[in-house]
């Protein structure tokens, strides 16, 4: 019984071991076959198609909501990019063909489809770029023409405006000067009868007043006398003393003149102040006589209103 049991057990072992080996081999084969089924061409096509679909229209949709000047910038970039893309697509088929010979036959049509879609996209971009180049090529010569016209208009306009302003000012002057003197025939308004002062200007970055009065004061050192009287006098009377140190109508006239006489020993230029002041008054009178357009009569109280409708009417006495 022992040898039979041994043979039986041996035969049963053989029967049990062979299926085990077959199952392992089948599992190995199934594992090898399953990755091929997972990495199918349909799945690869779906991934490629989704990527190409997202990359293609997104470039076209971006410049749509933007403003006009920004679209011009993108148009210029599209003009440069398709040339490089075409060159890449022209060189890519050779590289893909080389890889296709080495790789499996299943990947060949996938690469050919991608290149075909890329060439279609490049052809569409080329057509859009060529149309944009035509538009851009025509636009530059039209832009400088209105620019030159505007510059010419700006150069010619100020002359016309100046003439209009002068005419308007003359009309306003004619309407303002209505009251005229009966004796001299000149206007008696406040602007025309006001005395004219000597011209002055600001120097040293508009910090110093340059006028005839200031030249006389600084030339004769009278500014030092005004400064001393301002600091030595009281607060209530300092303004009057410093402004008019040579006035005879104010109080303490003798003390002020004695002080200026003592200062003239050290500053002899103070002696030139009285004649310089007289020359200044004479210059003021001459300038006022020449440039004052209004009436100078003192006792002419009779005036009449100028009639705009009758400008050539003679002067008549008021009723």
Curated annotation (Swiss-Prot):
Biological process annotations from GO: animal organ development; negative regulation of epithelial to mesenchymal transition; negative regulation of ERK1 and ERK2 cascade; negative regulation of fibroblast growth factor receptor signaling pathway; negative regulation of lens fiber cell differentiation; negative regulation of Ras protein signal transduction; negative regulation of transforming growth factor beta receptor signaling pathway
Question: Any stretches that span the bilayer, and where are they?
Answer: none
Q: Where is the composition biased (Low complexity)?
A: 112-131
Question: Where on the tree of life does the source sit, at the highest rank?
Answer: Eukaryota
Localization annotation: Cytoplasm; Membrane
Single GO cellular component term:
membrane
Xref: Pfam families = Sprouty
User: Is-annotated flag, keyword Electron transport?
Assistant: no
Chain intervals with Basic and acidic residues compositional bias: 69-79
Q: Where does the SPR domain lie? A: 183-295
* Region annotation Disordered: where it falls in the sequence: 54-157
Q: Which residues form a coiled coil?
A: none
N-acetylmethionine PTM positions: 1
Domain comment quoted from the record: The Cys-rich domain is responsible for the localization of the protein to the membrane ruffles.
Subunit annotation: Forms heterodimers with SPRY2. Interacts with TESK1. Interacts with CAV1 (via C-terminus).
- Protein purpose: Inhibits fibroblast growth factor (FGF)-induced retinal lens fiber differentiation, probably by inhibiting FGF-mediated phosphorylation of ERK1/2. Inhibits TGFB-induced epithelial-to-mesenchymal transition in lens epithelial cells.
Give the record's family classification: Belongs to the sprouty family.
Name the chain's protein: Protein sprouty homolog 1
Q: Which organism is it from?
A: Bos taurus
What gene makes this protein? SPRY1
